[in-house]
Amino acid sequence: PHPPPPPSPPIDMHSHAYRNDEAGIRQWVKTLDENNIEKVIVHTKAFGEEFDRLYDLFTGISDKFEVWCGFDMTKWDQPEFPECAVKELERCFAKGAGGVGELIDKGLGERISSSGREVGLHFNDPKFDALFEKCAELGMPVSIHSGDPIWMYEPLDSHNDGYMNAKHWWIDLSVPGTLDLDGVVDAFVECVERHPNTTFIACHLLNLNHDYARLGKILDSHPNLWIDISE
């Protein structure tokens, strides 16, 4: 038998534009209805015309989708980056973006969604300050994927408990400028501390599923930080 419905309808806080065709999205809505899921947060990490396209597509089909944008990293290495990126963030918000995500730093800094390139800017870099402060002003939560599970940073040998995943997602710490997991988490926590009025969501348990004691201490000391339990 189908399990009884939960006391409150669940919200899927971490999804992506896995389907971006009308038929696929309508089937998705049918699945949501069948399982009493109230809403899905669609992390597009997009901006500009691509964000507008995805926003119109999803929200034009169902109000179950809340569509989030990304940061415009186009001018990340130029002095005008903060001003230009904030302007685009405001535009996306006016369009209907409910938040920002999923931003990613696995060790080499924020990843540009259009190219997959990691640009060496960690989220505690002052270049992001104006963006995170604008998120606080607009009430836009920020979802950040910091690091990967610890096994992705360990040697690929018989002692690696997560070898089956690590062999596909291994992170080479010999690449110059790469932070290990502790370094990525520290950079993220510094960012959270620097922007106490901004709501942050740490994806995947902040990738500290090997150290819940540390995760608990971080959560206890940062009231503006939430986690999602997606894996």
Q: Residue locations for each model-derived region?
A:
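Short, acidic/polar
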Residues: 20-32, 78-92, 214
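Active-site gating/metal-coordination segments in enzymes
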Residues: 51-170
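Catalytic pocket-lining loop regions of alpha/beta-barrel enzymes
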Residues: 117-231
